[in-house]
């Protein structure tokens, strides 16, 4: 099948409100089978529309965003600026398209809107939106929607959801590949040591950004909780090197370049191998505090 372009997306538009959920389900399936059209750098005229549907983020005028931008630097401005200057440093195409001032404005506006603390890593989470979206305002709306609806526990001051995601990654790895799990454990390596950046940023901390965008298409379609399995899938791709290496943390400090197609394929296979109770906690860990209590009790 051809990639998903604007023509295919228009044909999918629901003819009535009753048909909407069916059309969204079809779009999710298309995202899994056929990638969203893009050039080698990940630029796509279709992706913003796909994300708008999958994130349930309809267009909004820019008045709100402009209002927050006009408030100027937030109380977290210095911390934001420190992180903005080192965001996706190896992604030259990103920096040719997205300015530091744009990223800084968006993050400060979010702090003003939500009265929230800025958490390190939010700079990387915001970056794909600024790269892919048609406007800074659209990027802000998508970013806000992601953090508020999909992973609110990831951006608490103590990043509870991220730490629970790391605990679940360990439990999933123990089930899915006991040999790799026990080898890493014998070296004192748990997910809290090597996987927190990949969990918090939904794998966007690993280059190239063009592949991360395709992974985000998949995560927005089926749930950002699947990023935990995407991280395991990335590890499976260089599993033998990890097991053969006397100091595997040397390899885990910098994951190999993303290959979205392979990562998604492995992730889909892994889902069916998890016990239902564990998958249920995985599906809820980024937004449900009650699931967090159960995760904290896991041994």
Swiss-Prot record:
GO terms for cellular component: Bfa1-Bub2 complex; cytosol; mitotic spindle pole body; nucleus; old mitotic spindle pole body. It is found in: Cytoplasm; Cytoplasm, Cytoskeleton, Microtubule organizing center, Spindle pole body. Keywords: Cell cycle, Cytoplasm, Cytoskeleton. Pfam families: RabGAP-TBC. Residues 41-223 form the Rab-GAP TBC domain. Its main location: cytoplasm. GO terms for biological process: negative regulation of division septum assembly; negative regulation of mitotic cytokinesis; negative regulation of septation initiation signaling. Belongs to the BUB2 family. PANTHER family: MITOTIC CHECK POINT PROTEIN BUB2, TBC1 DOMAIN FAMILY MEMBER GTPASE-ACTIVATING PROTEIN. Has a dual role in the cell cycle. In mitosis, it is involved in maintenance of cdc2 kinase activity. It is subsequently required for regulation of septum formation. Could be involved in maintenance of cdc2 kinase activity by preventing, directly or indirectly, the degradation of cyclin or the dephosphorylation of 'Thr-167' of cdc2. This is Cell division control protein 16.
């Amino acid at each position: 099948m051809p990639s998903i372009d604007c023509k295919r997306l228009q044909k999918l538009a629901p003819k009535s409100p009753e048909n909407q959920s069916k059309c969204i389900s079809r779009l999710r399936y298309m995202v899994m089978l056929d990638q969203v059209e893009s050039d080698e750098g990940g630029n796509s005229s279709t992706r913003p529309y796909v994300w708008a549907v999958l994130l349930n983020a309809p267009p909004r005028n820019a008045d709100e965003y402009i209002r927050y931008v006009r408030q100027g630097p937030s109380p977290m401005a210095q911390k934001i600026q420190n992180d903005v200057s080192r965001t996706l440093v190896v992604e030259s195409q990103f920096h040719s398209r997205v300015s530091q001032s744009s990223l800084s404005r968006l993050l400060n506006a979010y702090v003003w809107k939500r009265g929230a603390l800025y958490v390190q890593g939010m700079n990387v989470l915001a970056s794909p939106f600024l790269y892919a979206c048609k406007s800074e305002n659209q990027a802000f709306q998508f970013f806000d929607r992601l953090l508020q609806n999909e992973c609110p526990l990831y951006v608490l001051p103590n990043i509870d959801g991220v730490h629970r995601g790391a605990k679940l990654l360990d439990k999933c790895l123990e089930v899915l590949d006991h040999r790799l799990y026990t080898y890493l454990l014998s070296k004192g390596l748990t997910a809290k040591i090597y996987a927190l950046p990949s969990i918090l940023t939904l794998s966007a901390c690993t280059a190239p950004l063009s592949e991360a965008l395709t992974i985000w298409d998949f995560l927005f379609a089926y749930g950002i909780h699947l990023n935990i399995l995407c991280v395991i899938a990335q590890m499976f791709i260089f599993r033998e090197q990890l097991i053969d290496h006397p100091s595997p943390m040397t390899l885990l400090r910098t994951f190999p370049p993303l290959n979205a197609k392979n990562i998604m394929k492995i992730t889909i296979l892994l889902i069916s191998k998890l016990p239902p109770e564990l998958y249920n906690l995985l599906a809820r860990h980024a937004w449900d505090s009650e699931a967090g209590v159960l995760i904290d009790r896991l041994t």
